């Protein structure tokens, strides 16, 4: 049975939080997000913030992108980016390490939409089929993305048609991820 995106994302997020609490005794922490306002912040330390996910309110969609580019986005991407505010989360899948991108705040949601538009415009200019990024890797040119046509999750080289299947659906991708702590 295919989990819905909301359930799969909540499940992965909880596994990530559980790992942090087991390994460190506290909620996930971020030095990179220190000083950046967010509804996720539970506590601010000397040089880091401790966070936990919060409901994405008010409800939102990525219809601004659809209108701007006259494209219908795969429904899974709406669900993925509008379920929760959270910090980015690290995970492994096979021999790949990913940073799963999340929305930190309302301002971050605006930036995300601008970046997705830029990504889609670049793909259109290069005559590539549209994808929507989900996670980064250690290489600036490689990312995990949702294929807007098939709904597959692929490992893609930015600006190239080189793509490797990671999972048949986004929910399968999220379910297969193994959370890891940042190094």
UniProtKB/Swiss-Prot annotation:
GO terms for cellular component: cytoplasmic side of plasma membrane. It is a peripheral membrane protein. Keywords: Cell inner membrane, Cell membrane, Membrane. The keyword Membrane applies. Coiled coil: none annotated. It is found in: Cell inner membrane. Belongs to the Syd family. It comes from Yersinia pestis. InterPro entries: Syd, Syd_sf. Pfam families: Syd. This is Protein Syd. It comes from the Bacteria.
